[in-house]
Each structure stands twice: as C-alpha cells, then as structure tokens.
Amino acid sequence: MAETTEPPSDAGTSQADAMALAAEAEAAEAEALAAAARARARAARLKREALAMAPAEDENVPEEYADWEDAEDYDDYDDYEAADQEAARSASWRRRLRVRLPRLSTIAMAAAVVIICGFTGLSGYIVWQHHEATERQQRAAAFAAGAKQGVINMTSLDFNKAKEDVARVIDSSTGEFRDDFQQRAADFTKVVEQSKVVTEGTVNATAVESMNEHSAVVLVAATSRVTNSAGAKDEPRAWRLKVTVTEEGGQYKMSKVEFVP
C-alpha cells in the first residue's frame, strides 16, 4: 500500500505556530496564577471577617478556615489586583502576537517578491545592455571593414589592368564619392596606363570616430608602395584618411573620402 507523503510545512509558518503556542501557554499559566491569587485573597478576607466576629480569647476557629493559613500573605486586594493585571497583560500580549506574526510573515513574503522582481528586472536590463553593446560592436566592425577595403582598392592599382582596378573602386563606393570618381574614371585610367603605375596599398589601422544607424566616419591609416615610369621603385607613401562609410543594401561602401594632414 503506497504511503501518502504530506508536503513539508512552511518553516516560517511552523515557527509562527510554535511562538503562538508558547504565548498561549504563558498566558494560561498567568491566568492560573491570577485565579489562585484571587482565591487566597478571598480566603484571607473571609478569615479576617470570621476572626472579627469571634471573641478574642475564643480559640475555636471553624474548620473551614483551617486551611487558609497560607493566605496570610494577602492582607488586602493589592496582590489580587496585581495578579489580575498580570493575567490581562499576558492575554493582551498573546492577542498582539497572533496579529503580529501573520503580519510579519506577509511583509517577509512581500519583500521576497520585491527582491525577486528586482533581480529579474536587473537581469533583463543586463542582457539587453549586453545585446546592445554586442550589436554596436558588430556594426562598428562592419563599417571599419568597409572603409579598409575601399582604401585598399583606391591604393592598389596596376596599369596592366587599370580599367578593372578603377571599376573595383567604383563598385566599393557610393553617393558623392562614387559620382565624382565615376566622372573622372576615364581620365584617371589613362594617367595610370601612361605612367605605368603599380601601387600596392596596405591599411595599418582603422578607428570608428562616429556612427549612426546607416553610416559611420572611420579614420584610416594606410601605406602604399609606388612604382612608375618616372623612376619610382616601391617608394613608400603614407596616407591618413577620414572615410565616411554608408550601408547600402547590406554592403558597406565609401561615400566620402577626405585626406587628413
């Protein structure tokens, strides 16, 4: 036969019940003491009345008063009233305890709920912040990569395939820069072919200066080695550029190029 397992009682409730039972026991004890005190006080009063009515020399005290010797300590009602007040205080404390314990339990539960909600909100905020930071880093990296590739295309030319190299520069640009470069593409191609220019560009560093949803300004440090018919042979050239990169159809292209002194 399967045993039925009762769910464990709540620790907070068990403690509250124990405290309430202890309070009830103390109150009951106080009430018993008060009742005994009242009985002794009443016995003392009756004894005094009986003795007052009998002659001073009469030693025949009624038998019902023989057991009242222990009431000698109660000369008046002071002890009776003190005991009664003590019992009243115990009962009052017990009532306050019964009210206070559930109230404290409710406050503790409410505090726990508030703390849990606070931690949940904080965790959500941290996750959101992490997501935002990760997305921003990814976008910055994409803009920097677009600037890097555009500058490499601009500084890497070979007169043997000048048209293809110029077309690659146009393909990696957009907006104002693309329009200007495309207008001068034919003349630029002729200069490269006639001068027998061969350049190989390298981007050394990039840094995103500013960024919004669709574009970014990227600082680029680059070098190139130039060989031409004028006598240059792998001559190094240094370039410092400020490149505006714009997202266009999921691609990151140069839309403006400025030379920085």
Curated annotation (Swiss-Prot):
It is found in: Membrane. It comes from Mycobacterium tuberculosis (strain CDC 1551 / Oshkosh). Residues 1-22 are annotated as: Disordered. Its main location: membrane. It is a single-pass membrane protein. To M.tuberculosis Rv1362c. PANTHER family: OUTER MEMBRANE PROTEIN RV1973 (PTHR37042:SF4). Keywords: Membrane, Transmembrane, Transmembrane helix. The keyword Membrane applies. This is Uncharacterized protein MT1408. The chain crosses the membrane at residues 107-127. It comes from the Bacteria. One of its GO terms (cellular component) is membrane.
